[in-house]
Amino acid sequence: MNRESENRRRNQRNVQRTNAVMGACAVALLAAQAASPAHAGAYEQARRIYERLDGVQPSATVLNTMANDILSQPGQAGLLAAAVVATDPHTGANFYDATLKEFINPWTNRNQSAFVPFNDYTATVIGMIRDDIPFNTVLSANILYTVNAPGLPAASPANNDHYATAEANGVDFATALQQTTQTVAYGTPSQGVAGVWTTHTGAAAYFVLGTNRAQFRFTMLNYLCHDMQLVMDNTRPTDRIRQDVARSPGGDSRVFLDNCAGCHSGMDPMAQAFAYYDFNSTTNEMVYTPGQVVPKYVKNPQNFPWGFVTPNDDWANRWRTGPNADLGWDQSLPGSGEGAASLGQELENTTAFANCQVVKVFQTVCMRTPTSSADQATVASIQALFTQSNYDLKQVFQQSAAACAGT
């Protein structure tokens, strides 16, 4: 009996050893078949493109599709075709559900946190990118994206419950977002709508309390990649700086002339575009009062009674001349206007706006700042294509992923 058991165990070990050898040979054979430099390189590039855009590994089917695109279309064309697959709502849902959400969320709050509940601002930008809406309308268009899914409260100008519930329910935002307008969904008069500025989230973050200068400052930071210290210009006239800015802080007028005036002389004439906006913390809604300047624009008049008293929402861009002309203002626009939407058009059509979007995307996808001469040349090329292709930001993600597929 013992001898029979030993023979049985020996036979089992031999079978297992044989199977292991055969399995190893099969794997080696498959590896040899797939390991030609072009084949292996295509699969590695496809995997890298997908992981950079979606943050997860692709399925075998999607990976094969992307690799075949790369193999069948040598050069940049194949890499771009693969990136298109990775950003398709049906094969690259995580691009919308995770990558874009984390990319956009910091713009929606003063703490610049990516970890905030899903909201109307983020949803609208994701929808614009998915649907190839020209991104140089993000600060001016009458647009809003809501979620088309069962069991959700209606979109409301007073909260983000509609969006937070959708996120909690695991809704696929890649396919569930639907376009509407803020006028239809929130009842905001069309003349008072200005892209993401007037979403519930945009208003709650940047029109609440204060003087509405925060909306301008964070727009410069998030959309032109310039914080205020980078655009200080003490050569601009000071005649439209409001009363609340002391001209001799601490009894020293040099502080105003050397510091305060450099920002306020350009910012205050443009932030006048927001003169009819406030945020009511009791009702939790944006307030828009066409024709009536909100009280925050005339607060603390005792600081300098001879300062500018805001009469309306007419704005003017004093930075079109001087050092801030380098921001690249669109000469086809007048440089002045009435209300927030026209100011949005002024800002979103600058060279700085286009460059900012491309640099942010490049940093996100390529995981590095474009400081080398090669990276700067890549950014310049993508930026040119961005403006020439109707400001399609999804293409910027695709082009950045293709450019960094080998690094």
Which ranges hold each PLM region?
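Boundary at the C-terminal end of the N-terminal hydrophobic targeting segment
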Residues: A34-A42
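Bacterial N-terminal signal peptides
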Residues: M22-A32
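Extended surface/linker regions that mediate inter-domain or inter-protein docking
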Residues: L79-M270, E348, A352, F362-V365, ...
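Substrate/cofactor-recognition hotspot
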Residues: A42-A93, D97-L100, Y277-W329, S336, ...
